[in-house]
Each structure stands twice: as structure tokens, then as C-alpha cells.
Design a protein with these regions (language model features):
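Core dinuclear metal-dependent hydrolase active-site scaffold
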Residues: 155-187
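Active-site HxH/HxHxD metal-binding segment of metal-dependent hydrolases
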Residues: 77-157, 161
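Bacterial N-terminal signal peptides
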Residues: 2-13
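Conserved beta-strand hairpin/beta-sheet module of binuclear metal-dependent hydrolase folds
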Residues: 28-78, 183-195
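C-terminal regulatory/interaction regions
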Residues: 263-304
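Boundary at the C-terminal end of the N-terminal hydrophobic targeting segment
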Residues: 14-20
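Divalent-metal (often Zn2+) His-rich catalytic cores of metallo-beta-lactamase-fold enzymes
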Residues: 215-266
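Active-site neighborhood of phospho(di)ester-bond hydrolases with catalytic His/Asp-centered motifs
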Residues: 63-65, 88-96, 114-117, 174, ...
Length: 304
């Protein structure tokens, strides 16, 4: 037996007996596990993102697989509590490690992995960095931090339809926003949108792509005909327009205050200390993430 398959089989056996993550059916046939609001630098354990699955009449689609093989195996075991149908697709909403490292749990016959056309390259570029995090926080050796890249790729501003059996889902890819690898998944039966990290509720939004692109993508999503949104982090909401507008307002404020700081020749550290502070009571982990967002956008905006 090849080593990678032995490892995957062995790991499934270890973790299958005691799943520790719980799922809620937020719409008919749509199950979500909410990750904890923890920062990667603070007690990261691979379970900080929302993950879940959609059950059709013939098959199942997994939406994000978690931050470790352990979480992926617990997800796989939990699915069997709700359905005996096969997992047909695993869809990653973007490249961040808390959403992709459970993929290896689902390797098998007739399982396709779906993602943004830029996702395979982005995963490869971050592989060594992610391995260091997995080793430091999860005690996972590098040779056991297994990346499974998508084999079905979607280009920006394009959508593809996949049928789970009388249940069609639409996967749409975007230009740079939260990252360069963002996709959303729309369940057409229930008008439910899995937004990935294009939406944060409660937790401070993260910019790892482009703030202007993020603002623009939110405008596009606001035009959709949907009833429920599942964010990448936080509570699913039917008040989804308010949630996106709250996030977008934060970005617009941050953009404008960083631009003003640059125009006034204010340095990066002072800008980190001051920009966006009026939003501090509205978001969790604000003191950690707001500064990172400024550190990301300040150098780019200096050249605008």
C-alpha cells in the first residue's frame, strides 16, 4: 500500500471513533459546524472555520474541510450520522489553511475537488509556511500535512453547476478580494449561499487579497437572490445584507482612513494604532486583526 494511502486509512481509523465536532441543519439538507473565534497565533487547533456539507438525493458536497486531517476525519464521520450517500465533491472556498487541510480525509474513487483556478498555485506557494504552523500548533509532522489541490478549476467571474441529485449547486469564482482564490457556493434549492471568508460575522474580517476588490465583490453578492448566508467564520444569518454591509462599511472606513494617513505622511505604525479604531467594539479579535489588515493594505495604497 502506498505510504500516503496507508497514512490516510490509519488516520481515519484513529479519529473515526470519537468525533468531537457538532453540526446544525441550518436549512433542509445543509449542515454547518461553526469554528471557534480563535486567532491562529493563540491556541490554534485546526477548528476555527465554518465547515459543512450539502446532501442531495444521490450524493453529498463538502464545503471546506477544516484545518487538519483530524478535523477532516471528524467531519467525514459526522456526515455518516446524517446520510449514507457518497461524498461526490469537496469544495474549498479559498486557500487558507483552516479551510483546506481536511481534504485528505476524502481522497477516494469518484471524489472531485473543486476550487478557484488560482488555488493549486496558492496552496503550493504557502505549503512550507503552513507546514510550520501545523507542526508548531497541531504537532503534525511536515510529511503528514497533506495538501489535496482541486482538480476542477473555476476561473474568476465564472460559475459552474454541479448536481447532487435533484439538488443543484452553483460555484462562482471571483477576482481578488479576501484572497486571490475565493469562491462561493449557492444551493439553488434553498437559496443558501456559502460565502467562505468573503463574509465574517462577529469576528473581524481579514484582508489577505485586496481591499478594493473585496468591496467590489460584496457589491456583486448584494445583488444575489438568496435567503441565508453561511459565513466563513461566525453565525449563519438570514439578515445577510446587513452582515455584508457591516463588513463593507468597515473596509470603506479603513480604506479612507489609511488613505488619509498616507496623504498626511503618517507612518505605518501610527496608522496601525489609529485607523479603524471606531469599529473596535463591533468585532471580536479586533486588536489583533485590524493591525494586520492595515499592514496588508498600507504598502499597496502608498503607490495608488
Amino acid at each position: 500500500m502506498p505510504l500516503i494511502l496507508f497514512f490516510l486509512t490509519f488516520s481515519v481509523f484513529i479519529y473515526a471513533s470519537s468525533p468531537s465536532i457538532e453540526f446544525e441543519e441550518v436549512a433542509p439538507g445543509i449542515f454547518v459546524h461553526q469554528g471557534e473565534h480563535l486567532d491562529v497565533d493563540e491556541t490554534y487547533h485546526g477548528d476555527i472555520a465554518n465547515i459543512g456539507f450539502i446532501v442531495g438525493e444521490e450524493s453529498i458536497a463538502v464545503i471546506d474541510s477544516g484545518g487538519s486531517l483530524k478535523i477532516g476525519n471528524e467531519l467525514k464521520t459526522a456526515i455518516r450520522k446524517f446520510s449514507k450517500l457518497p461524498v461526490r465533491y469537496v469544495i474549498n472556498t479559498h486557500v487558507h489553511l483552516d479551510h483546506i487541510y481536511g481534504n485528505a480525509s476524502f481522497v477516494g474513487e469518484n471524489v472531485d475537488f473543486i476550487g478557484h483556478v488560482e488555488l493549486p498555485k496558492a496552496m503550493a506557494l504557502r505549503k512550507e509556511f503552513y507546514e510550520r504552523i501545523n507542526l508548531e500548533y497541531l504537532d503534525v509532522p511536515n510529511d503528514q500535512s497533506i495538501q489535496i489541490a482541486p482538480n476542477i478549476l473555476i476561473k474568476p467571474n465564472e460559475s459552474k453547476i454541479f448536481d447532487l441529485g435533484n439538488r443543484k449547486i452553483k460555484v462562482t469564482a471571483y477576482s481578488i478580494a479576501h484572497t486571490k482564490t475565493d469562491v462561493t457556493i449557492e444551493d439553488l434549492n434553498t437559496k443558501t449561499l456559502w460565502a467562505g471568508d468573503l463574509l465574517f460575522t462577529e469576528r473581524t474580517p481579514v484582508i489577505d487579497g485586496d481591499i478594493h476588490g473585496f468591496i467590489d465583490v460584496i457589491d456583486k453578492i448584494l445583488m444575489l437572490d438568496i435567503d441565508l448566508v453561511i459565513p466563513g467564520h461566525g453565525t449563519p444569518t438570514k439578515k445577510w445584507k446587513e452582515a455584508f454591509l457591516k463588513e463593507q462599511n468597515y473596509f470603506k472606513l479603513l480604506r479612507d482612513e489609511v488613505r488619509l494617513a498616507i496623504d498626511n505622511d503618517q507612518d505605518l505604525q501610527l496608522t496601525i494604532d489609529t485607523a479603524g479604531q471606531s469599529e473596535s467594539e463591533k468585532w471580536e479579535l479586533f486588536d489583533i486583526q485590524n493591525g494586520r489588515n492595515i499592514n496588508k493594505i498600507f504598502p499597496t495604497m502608498e503607490w495608488e
